[in-house]
Amino acid sequence: MGKIIGIDLGTTNSCVSVLENGKAKVIENAEGARTTPSIIAYANDGEILVGQSAKRQAVTNPHNTLFAVKRLIGRRFEEEVVQKDIKLVPYKIVKANNGDAWVEASGKQMAPPQISAEVLKKMKKTAEDYLGEAVTEAVITVPAYFNDSQRQATKDAGRIAGLDVKRIINEPTAAALAYGMDKAKGDHTVIVYDLGGGTFDVSVIEIAEVDGEHQFEVLATNGDTFLGGEDFDMRLIDYLVDEFKKESGMDLKNDPLALQRLKEAAEKAKIELSSSQSTDVNLPYITADATGPKHLNVKISRAKLESLVEDLVTRTIEPCRIALKDAGIDASKIDDVILVGGQTRMPMVQKAVSDFFGKEARKDVNPDEAVAMGAAIQGAVLAGDVKDVLLLDVSPLTLGIETMGGVMTALIEKNTTIPTKKSQVFSTADDNQGAVTIHVLQGERKQAAQNKSLGKFDLADIPPAPRGVPQIEVTFDIDANGILHVGAKDKATGKEQKITIKANSGLSDEEIQKMVRDAELNAEEDRKFEELAAARNQGDALVHSTRKMIADAGDKVTAEEKTAIEAAVVALEAAVKGDDKAAIDAKVEELSKVSAPVAQKMYAEQAQPAEGAAPHDEKAEKADDVVDAEFEEVKDHK
C-alpha cells in the first residue's frame, strides 16, 4: 500500500509532508522550497502555472492570477465577506448558477475547489517525485472553524486532484499532533493559536497518556474564517495607496497592475518589519500621467504597521477567551502555547498572545510546517503505520434544524467530540400535514435565518393525523471528517429519508466528475507539451552537432552530401519551430539518415592508427552521442 501523505492546503502557502522512519518529513518542491505559494495563474498560451512560477508573473498578469481562493471555498456569492473580497482582489469573483462564489480567469468560470485542486496536484506531484511512487491517498487540513460546506468543498478539491481524501483534519489539531508526538509522557493542556494567511483558529487541546496510548483530545475550538495575513497586507496596501494619493493626487486602487505590485511590496515590508524597526517601500514607475511617470517611495516604521493592524490583532483575543470558557479551563492552567501560521511571526501578535495567556509561546514549532507534519502523522495512523495514537476532535459549530416560528433547535452542540450521532423526535405543525421539510442549519444563533443553511429535504407520505401526533425522528450523524449526514424517519410507517448534507449550493457529483476529467485532460496536455519540448531539444541538438560535423569534415564532404544535409537541417529547423512532434521526429530521422554516411566516413578515418585521434574528439564527432547527452541534460533541468 502506498503512503498516505499530509497536505496543509493554506490560503497563502501550502506544504506537504510524509512519515518516514517514524518522523514526519516536509518534502521540498521542484524549486527546492519547503512551502509552495497557493497561487494559480492562467498564461496567455493556455499553460497553468502553480506556486512560485505563478507568483513571479502576477504583476504582469493580475486578472488571471488567482490567490487566497481558500477564502471563497464553500461560500455563497451574496455573503458579506465575499462582497468585501470582490473590492480587494484584481481577479473576477462571479456568481455561479447555484449561487456559489466562483472565480473567472482567461474568460472561464471556475469553482474554488477546481482552483485548489491545482495546488493539491502540485503537492501530490512533489510527494511522488520524492517517494518515487504514485500517491493516491491524503489527509488534508482545514481551519477548525470551517463549516460543513467548506469541508465538503475541500474534499471535492481533493477528488478533482485525483486524491482519495482519507480524512479532513483541523489545522490546530494537526499542529498539536506534530508538537505532542515526541513529548515526554504525562498530561499537558496546550493552546494552538493559528493565524494563517486567510483564517484564524484557536483550539484548547489536552494531550494525555491513556492506557499507554497517546490521546489528543480537543476540548474546545473557536475562530474566524475571514481573518488572516491577507487582511494585514490589505491594511498596509490601503495606507500606501492613501500616502501616494496625498502626494500625487492619483488613486492606484483602479490600476490592477499597480495593485499587484503594491501587494507584493506590502507583504515584503510586513515580513521585514518583524525583524527590523523600519523599512522603505520603493516602487519606481508605479503609474504615469500627462506629466510623466510617477514613483512611490514610502518609509514605514514597525510602530506605524502596528497602529494599522492593532484592531485585527485584538480581534483574535475574543475567540481565545471563548475557547477557554467553552473548555472550562483557566488561562493559568495552560501548559504550552503553540503558534501556527506565518502571521504569528509578527512581534505584536506574539506579545498579544503571551499577555493574554500569561506565558511565552514555544519557539520549537515551525509555524509554516507543523500543520502538514501533523497531517502526515494522522495519515500514518490511518495507514496503520503509527499505533497508540488516538485523536478526538470536535464539531466547531452547533448543528440543528428549523422548527416552528423560525427557531433553530440544536441537535448537536458546538465542541461535541466527533464522530457523533444524535436523534430527536419532532412532530407536525398542522392537522393532516402530509409532509415535513427538514431544514438543516449550522451556527450559534437562536433565529434560524441568522444561521448558515446547509440544506433542505422532505419526508413525504405522512399518514393524516392531528397536529402533534405523528412522530418524526431526526438523526444527525457527524463522521470523523466533520461532515454531516442527516436522516428523518416517520416512526409510524417506518418511512425514512437520508441525505449526506451537501450545501444547498455546493458541487454536484456530475460537476465534480467533469472537473476530474478536465484535470486529467490537463495532465495529458502537460505530458504532450513535455514530449514536444524534448523532441525540440533533440532536434536543436542534432542541428548543432551536424553543423559542427560538416565544419570539421571540410573537403571530406562532397557537394551533393553537403546540399542534402543542409536541406535536411533547414527542414528540421522549420519543424522545430512548429507544434507537431511527429513532424519533428520524422525530420530528425531524415537528417540522421543523410548525415550518417559522412559520420561513418569520418569515424573510419579517425579509427585508422595513423590518424590517432584523441578519445574526446571521437566522442564529439559522434552525432548520436551528442544528441543523447544534450537531450538528457535538458530534461533534467525541466
From Swiss-Prot:
Residues 614-625 have a biased composition (Basic and acidic residues). One of its GO terms (molecular function) is unfolded protein binding. Residues 602-638 are annotated as: Disordered. The modification Phosphothreonine is found at residue 199. Keywords: ATP-binding, Chaperone, Nucleotide-binding, Phosphoprotein, Stress response. It holds the Pfam family HSP70. Residues 604-613 have a biased composition (Low complexity). Induction: By stress conditions e.g. heat shock. InterPro entries: ATPase_NBD, Chaperone_DnaK, Heat_shock_70_CS, HSP70_C_sf, HSP70_peptide-bd_sf, Hsp_70_fam. Acts as a chaperone. Belongs to the heat shock protein 70 family. This is Chaperone protein DnaK. The gene is dnaK.
